[in-house]
């Protein structure tokens, strides 16, 4: 209990800013936001860190993962590689500014994920349907519409 309280207290500092920096630093050091997220999942499942505190860590991890692309782009010749790496970075930073910076939008991703998780626990087929829709059907429809 003391460990859980301590971790949540540290991650909750600065309105989530400390958690974002921690997520970014972990991801930069391991060069993978997937590893950072994979570390957090069992902690959330065990109740060691609250979902509200894990959320800004994952946001920081998403920014941290752009460092790898920026480093690779700096090694390339020409400006195209750096341009797209900066677009990737700014996309993630602007996502934080919009979703985390506007207080009434901040809980939206967690609420949506909690709703989807509750549905998936009751009916796995809904989770599979959501994944297929988001990653296959919707992209194919967008491609077909804008061809």
What residues fall within each predicted segment?
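Juxtamembrane and boundary regions of transmembrane helices in multi-pass small-molecule transporters
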Residues: 71-147
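Membrane-interfacial helix-loop connectors
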Residues: 25-93
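Hydrophobic alpha-helical transmembrane segments
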Residues: 17-21, 55, 85-86, 128-130
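Membrane-embedded alpha-helical segments and adjacent helix-loop junctions characteristic
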Residues: 1-30, 34-45, 111-115
């Amino acid at each position: 209990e003391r460990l859980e309280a301590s971790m949540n207290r540290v991650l909750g500092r600065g309105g989530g800013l400390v958690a974002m920096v921690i997520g970014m630093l972990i991801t930069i050091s391991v060069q993978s936001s997937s590893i950072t997220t994979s570390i957090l999942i069992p902690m959330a499942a065990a109740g060691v860190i609250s979902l509200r505190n894990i959320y800004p860590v994952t946001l920081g991890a998403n920014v941290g993962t752009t460092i790898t692309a920026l480093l690779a782009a700096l090694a390339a010749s020409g400006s195209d590689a750096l341009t797209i790496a900066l677009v990737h970075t700014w996309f993630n930073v602007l996502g934080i500014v919009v979703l985390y910076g506007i207080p009434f939008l901040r809980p939206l991703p967690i609420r949506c994920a909690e709703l989807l998780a509750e549905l998936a626990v009751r009916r796995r087929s809904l989770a599979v349907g959501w994944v297929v829709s988001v990653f296959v059907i919707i992209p194919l429809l967008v491609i077909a519409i804008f061809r």
